[in-house]
Amino acid sequence: GVTGFGFDLVRYLFAGVVDGR
């Protein structure tokens, strides 16, 4: 997500969902 680039990357890689909360 826009408010969590770091988490966004992890989410995208593992979950495949762009949601960096």
UniProtKB/Swiss-Prot annotation:
Function per UniProt: Catalyzes the transfer of a methyl group from 5-methyltetrahydrofolate to homocysteine resulting in methionine formation.
Catalytic activity: 5-methyltetrahydropteroyltri-L-glutamate + L-homocysteine = tetrahydropteroyltri-L-glutamate + L-methionine
A molecular function GO annotation: 5-methyltetrahydropteroyltriglutamate-homocysteine S-methyltransferase activity
Alphabetized UniProt keyword annotations: Amino-acid biosynthesis, Cytoplasm, Metal-binding, Methionine biosynthesis, Methyltransferase, Transferase, Zinc
UniProt GO BP: methionine biosynthetic process; methylation
Pathway(s) where this gene product acts: Amino-acid biosynthesis; L-methionine biosynthesis via de novo pathway; L-methionine from L-homocysteine (MetE route): step 1/1
UniProt keyword annotation of Transmembrane helix present: no
Domain of life where this protein originates: Eukaryota
Source lineage: Eukaryota, Viridiplantae, Streptophyta, Embryophyta, Tracheophyta
Enzyme class, broadest EC rank: transferase
Subcellular location, record wording: Cytoplasm
Full protein name: 5-methyltetrahydropteroyltriglutamate--homocysteine methyltransferase
GO CC annotation, single: cytoplasm
Cofactor needs: Zn(2+)
